[in-house]
Amino acid sequence: MFTGIIRDKGKIISISEGDKSRRITMKTKIDLEPISIGASVACDGCCLTVVEKTQDTLTFDVGAETMDLTTLGDWEIDKCVNLETSLRMGDELGGHMVSGHVDGIAIVESVKPDGESWRFKIRVPDQFAQYISPKGSVALNGISLTVNEVEGAVFGVCIIPHTWDVTNIKSWDEGTRINLEVDQLARYVARILQK
């Protein structure tokens, strides 16, 4: 489990293409001492398993389904990736509960400055619109964000300077594809109401 509070922006330094898979290595400033082989790390919101590590790099294998359902198939060398290590007992629960199981790909519709902050409009696939509500939570590229307003399959978020600085959100432009994970509680409530 994760909280959507980004720990570092990793930088992809190598990608090895396999048969319907990729091996991705990224450099990070996270203290890797407590992270073991087999540990889970959220990479742009997608829970991946550490298969190799050095003092300052992590390596992950990415399968075909993950590449199909997320933006990971689009990644290239030098891409900046939001990283979050998994929760440990005693960690602060600062964002919201994030599983790292990406639901699909959302598209940035617009980015506008708003004083010291930025307003983003995000379009989600129609089947996920029912899980997005004002003042609810959503994870975009692994970042825990609060929904400001909703109109159909488009919703708005406001990005404060701190989030702008410590995540890869400043690289998002109109048309950027981003990983979407809807709030788990919203999903469960919708499921119960369907019965």
Question: Where are the regions that the model predicts?
Answer:
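Conserved loop->alpha-helix
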Residues: 1-195
